[in-house]
Amino acid sequence: MKNVLRSTVIVSLALGLVGAAAYAAPAPAAPAKGAFQRDLLGVYSDAEKKTLDLEEAVPQNKFDWRPAPGVRSIAEAYLHIAFGNYAVIKFATGKEPPAEVGFEMNPAKWDKKTKDKAEIKKILEASFAHVHNAIGAVSDADLDKTVNLFGHDMTVRATLIALSGHLNEHLGQSVAYARANKVTPPWSKDEKAHEKASMAEKKP
């Protein structure tokens, strides 16, 4: 567990420090090869859906909002998620981002690609599809191979877990940003509606 947490911290720090293309519809991902890969993608998919739902809920005029100078804006936080998806998958599996993405290993530049809500959604969707395709192709034998991620040696397994942690970290950041702008996460609304319905059913 300590190694996994350490890997997540390394990914988060490295992606913050590492010094408009057309986005074609990605091909459907093949079924994952092993139980770990399937379980990881299941957890990842939940955070992925919440990220896309939240991005959709935030109005365009809030995408350049940031909590303080020098801190990522709403748009930049979403773009940084996509950056992490492409960068970590490249190191973990060797799978390069599609050429049409125009990926650069430069988060400061990538995170400022655009402020357009619709384009950011396409960028996120393409990066999520890339993650699914890459992890789905990883064999069980590959999981224990050692890769070098920003100067740190770790297994492919730990690197992929850290990737999921990176998504959840910035989903949490995006939730805080949304609430600061009076936007309630869609799944939170659904949970409250379900609770009210359940309470109504219990009343005599």
Label every PLM stretch briefly.
Residues 1-6:
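Positively charged n-region of N-terminal signal peptides that target proteins for export
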Residues 8-20:
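Bacterial N-terminal signal peptides
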Residues 20-29:
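Boundary at the C-terminal end of the N-terminal hydrophobic targeting segment
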Residues 28-41:
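Short, low-complexity N-terminal intrinsically disordered segments enriched in polar/charged residues
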Residues 41-45, 52, 62-105, 148-204:
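Short, contiguous alpha-helical
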Residues 58-59:
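Membrane-proximal, proline-rich intrinsically disordered regions
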Residues 109-147, 155-169:
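Acidic/histidine-rich alpha-helical segments that form the ligand environment
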